[in-house]
A protein has these predicted regions:
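C-terminal motif of bacterial Sec signal peptides marking the signal peptidase cleavage site
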Residues: 4-7
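Edge beta-strand at a domain terminus
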Residues: 64-71, 159-203
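Mid-length scaffold segments of soluble, non-membrane domains
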Residues: 80-142
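Short, solvent-exposed aromatic-acidic interface loops
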Residues: 123-130, 147-152, 183-190
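A short, polar/proline- and glycine-enriched secondary-structure boundary/capping micro-motif
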Residues: 128-135, 153-158, 190-196
Length: 203
């Protein structure tokens, strides 16, 4: 089951962080010693990616769709206590920057804990991955670093083992028991995938 996939990973290996003055996500954080330069640059440029994606969507006459998502597609929406509690979540994703509206069917995500660090795994058609969450200073946001699950497999590669399958994003709380994971595409100028996570009712 993918719900436990993130917990099956070995701790991701350290790689060199991006150098230079391009720091948007606060001062140096622990995640930078793990993230690739490519992913650090993409995360540092997330505000501009949001601007470009929303502008492209509105230019494609998708303003009503964007507005209908409320806080999910409001890059300024962020609440304190950003870390999601361990457990199951209903989730789906949208991609706001294309010529056509892209929204996935609902699926499930799972937040766990391994050796004191939060893990996240998704089970969505076309978006299956698992990895670790790194809390930023202040506690309002977390960095996700993980890997996409290969076809025919149940477990994602550890972050850094296969750079072509690496995934990096930003987690924020946007409502009661509601979170957002924003995944910038690694290529410069590419779009965004925004995953909504809503805590599933407990039986």
């Amino acid at each position: 089951m993918l719900a436990g996939a993130a917990a099956c990973q070995t701790a991701p290996p350290g790689t060199s962080a991006a150098a230079g003055p391009r720091v948007v996500l606060e001062e140096a954080e622990a995640w930078r010693s793990v993230a690739s330069e490519r992913d650090a640059v993409a995360l540092d440029g997330l505000a501009e990616r949001w601007r470009q994606a929303l502008a492209a969507g509105r230019a494609a006459n998708l303003s009503r769709r964007i507005a209908g998502e409320g806080e999910l597609l409001d890059p300024e929406a962020r609440l304190a206590r950003g870390a999601p509690a361990p457990g199951s979540y209903r989730c789906r994703y949208v991609r706001p920057g294309g010529r056509k509206w892209v929204s996935s069917a609902p699926g499930f995500c799972y937040v766990g804990v391994e050796e004191g660090q939060l893990t996240l795994a998704t089970e969505l058609r076309g978006l299956r991955f698992g990895g670790y969450l790194w809390e930023l200073k202040g506690g309002e946001r977390l960095i996700f670093l993980g890997g996409a699950v290969p076809a025919g497999s149940r477990t994602p590669p550890a972050y850094g083992d296969n750079p072509s399958r690496d995934a990096a994003g930003l987690v924020e709380r946007i409502g009661e028991f509601r979170y957002r994971l924003t995944l910038p595409e690694p290529a410069p100028g590419a779009g965004l995938t925004v995953v909504e996570l809503v805590a599933a009712p407990r039986d």
